[in-house]
Structures are given as structure tokens and as C-alpha cells.
């Protein structure tokens, strides 16, 4: 896929554009989920991957941005490294916690993995390209055509004017 090759020449991972919260990710998790599950994940990381603990604390206590949906693109080698790290942690967390019989809290492993991706990316100092995720459902389907039209027009305008921007005197002087 040539598009991915070009993309990965500029970054190491592609992630969903982050949501910005008015508080840190620890507070967000505790408001929406079970705090002890997160603290168990932190304990597992402290035991199995202690070098990641400062990054865990930074992501959860000094950060208010989160890329949701567990959607990302990585080169295969990095994906395999991330998966080995993540599932080693999640399987141990699963052994230690009581998974709730609740449609929301029962998805605890998904919620943890969304957040642990940021820990892994930070620890490995990956350069991120953020992309917008387009959600399509019955209510939004009517607006999709308009959105795609504007996206297409903006993309075409960008690429049509690209040669002009490359030759502009301002860019030549830079």
C-alpha cells in the first residue's frame, strides 16, 4: 500500500484524533468505570514492566487527551510488539479482577486497552499522525453526503493548489 508507506515516512503510528477532557484520564476513568480495575492494571505494569510505570503515571495523571475506539495503524513488527505487551498485561488483570455482569463495565478490557495504547506509544516515543474517525449511524447518515462532499472539495482544492504552494516565493526563500 503506497499510501501507508508515505504515511509511515512521516510518523510511526496512526491514531484516532484524541478527545480532550476537562480533567486527567485517571479522573475520567474513575468517573465512568471502576477505579480498582485501573489500579490493578497499574500494579500489573509495576510488576511486569516497571520501566513503563512513569509513562503510565504521566498518561493518566498529567494528561487529558485520549484516542478512543482501539483504532490505530502500525507496521507489523510494532503491532506484534504492542500486542505482546498489551495482552500480557490484560490477561493478568483479568485473573485479578472481577469482571462485572454489566453491558458497560463488562467491557473493562477494551476500556483499559484504549488507554494503555497511549502508555505504550509514550514509552516507545512514537511519532503520531492523528486522523479523524468518521462515525456513521442512522441519525448521521443524512449528513454524511454533505460531509463527504465538503471533504472531497477540500481535498481536491488542497491538491490542485499544491504545485502553486510548492513554487511560491515565500517557500523558495525558506
Map each language-model feature to its residues:
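ER/Golgi luminal nucleotide-sugar-dependent glycosyltransferases, focusing on the catalytic module
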Residues: 1-174
Amino acid at each position: 500500500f503506497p499510501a501507508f508507506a508515505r504515511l509511515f515516512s512521516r510518523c510511526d503510528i496512526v491514531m484516532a484524533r484524541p478527545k480532550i477532557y476537562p480533567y486527567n484520564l485517571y479522573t475520567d476513568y474513575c468517573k465512568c468505570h471502576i477505579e480498582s480495575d485501573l489500579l490493578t492494571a497499574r500494579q500489573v505494569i509495576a510488576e511486569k514492566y516497571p520501566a513503563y510505570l512513569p509513562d503510565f503515571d504521566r498518561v493518566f495523571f498529567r494528561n487529558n487527551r485520549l484516542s478512543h475506539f482501539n483504532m490505530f495503524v502500525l507496521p507489523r513488527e510494532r503491532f506484534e510488539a504492542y500486542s505482546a505487551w498489551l495482552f500480557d498485561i490484560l490477561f493478568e488483570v483479568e485473573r485479578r479482577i472481577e469482571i462485572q455482569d454489566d453491558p458497560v463495565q463488562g467491557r473493562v478490557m477494551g476500556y483499559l486497552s484504549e488507554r494503555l495504547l497511549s502508555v505504550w506509544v509514550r514509552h516507545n516515543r512514537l511519532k503520531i499522525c492523528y486522523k479523524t474517525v468518521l462515525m456513521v449511524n442512522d441519525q448521521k447518515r443524512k449528513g454524511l453526503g454533505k460531509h463527504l462532499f465538503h471533504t472531497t472539495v477540500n481535498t481536491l482544492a488542497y491538491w490542485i493548489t499544491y504545485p502553486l504552494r510548492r513554487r511560491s516565493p515565500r517557500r523558495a526563500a525558506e
